[in-house]
Amino acid sequence: MSEYLPEGKLISEQENINILHSLKMLEDAKNSEKILEAKACVCDSSHNLIVDLAGIKGIIPREEGAIGIKDGSVRDIAVISRVNRPVCFVVTDITEDENGKPIVMLSREKAQRKCLDAYISRLRCGDIVPARITHLENFGAFADIGCGIVALMPIDTISVSRIEHPAERFTVGMDIKAVIKSVENGRISLSHKELLGTWEENAERFCAGETVSGIIRNVENYGAFLELTPNLAG
């Protein structure tokens, strides 16, 4: 089970499920700082996330909810928005409440730090990584490339053929492959068009005289540009 995947990819893995069902295995995971995933059910009035660990209560304190929460560089919406979604974490402590029921203290921030140090910091331009689309804007798509750490894919890197909005290619929650385009000052930029084939590879799919359908992408006085594939227009 690889640890450094977009959030939501580990939650259904059998190893992850087995650990969540065992206090002993949760203790072992604490000692090894293993990254796990479970669903965040509630965000309380202090912005702590309550996580369901197969019937055991898990708590991610607000300041452990994401990198940047402690120093104020990231807003609390980064924590609040995780309700009803999978969250990654490492186990930091196992205690009991006043009734003797176990409470497991968790840190998403530590899981993200581990992902940054062991995985994302080692990525280089040209590397191909799994990613999950988290939200779309006019200027590009944001994608989780590991443990909830998000990178931007500018709209002009999504495909060779021009589009008006990333929603023409992606939907939120969609799993894709992405290419590391640049790494500058800790900020990662992604690209997708390199994975859609070259002009020649796309052109080989069509024959002269063949009737095909496409999308009109631009109209000029001298003609219209028709998209046949995301990386082929004529």
List where the protein language model places each region.
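Single-stranded RNA-binding regions, centering on S1/OB-family and related RNA-binding modules
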Residues: M1-G234
